[in-house]
Amino acid sequence: MSRRLVLAIAVAAVALLALGSLATASSSKTKTSKDTFAQFRMPSNNVFCAYVVSSSPYAKYLRCDIMSGIKPKPSGKRCVEGSRGVSADIDVTGRATFPCSSDTVYNKSATKLRYGKTWRRGGFTCKSKLAGLRCSNLSRHGFFLSRQHSYRF
């Protein structure tokens, strides 16, 4: 199952949870959508991120979309028509990738991660700075996104 499909399924599940139509029980308490899905955005409204926990092989992952101006363009990327831009994807222990994306995690209502603040969840850490967004996983792999510089590490 691709990460994109998993993300689409997770978004649908969160919508159902919000409507009270879906409940996922654990041994002693009910999991909430906050445990399985979270979103945040940069104050510039140019980077939007989604954290997803699923039962797929990509059990926990983070995806961030840069809406415009990624530099340099990831080498060899020729996105197909209809692509909305470049995303940064990473699972909890692997290396980050910069795939082309035909969907987006854009959500203007997502929590704003103010400059100088850090977001942590499920083995991921993201630091918001005026210079851009830096996210890493448990293996210390990650990515940096900004209009001026974007890279994986």
Language model regions located:
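Bacterial N-terminal signal peptides that target proteins for export
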Residues: 1-9
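Bacterial N-terminal signal peptides
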Residues: 9-18
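C-terminal region of N-terminal signal peptides and the immediate post-cleavage residues
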Residues: 17-32
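A low-complexity, Ser/Thr/Gly/Pro-enriched, surface-exposed linker/loop concept
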Residues: 29-31, 61-113, 145-153
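Extracellular glycan-recognition/adhesion modules and their associated mucin-like linkers
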Residues: 35-46, 116-121, 125
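Short, surface-exposed binding/anchoring microloops in extracellular/periplasmic proteins
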Residues: 43-72
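Acidic, glycine-rich flexible loop segments
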Residues: 101-134
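Extracellular glycan/ECM-engagement signal in secreted proteins
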Residues: 127-153
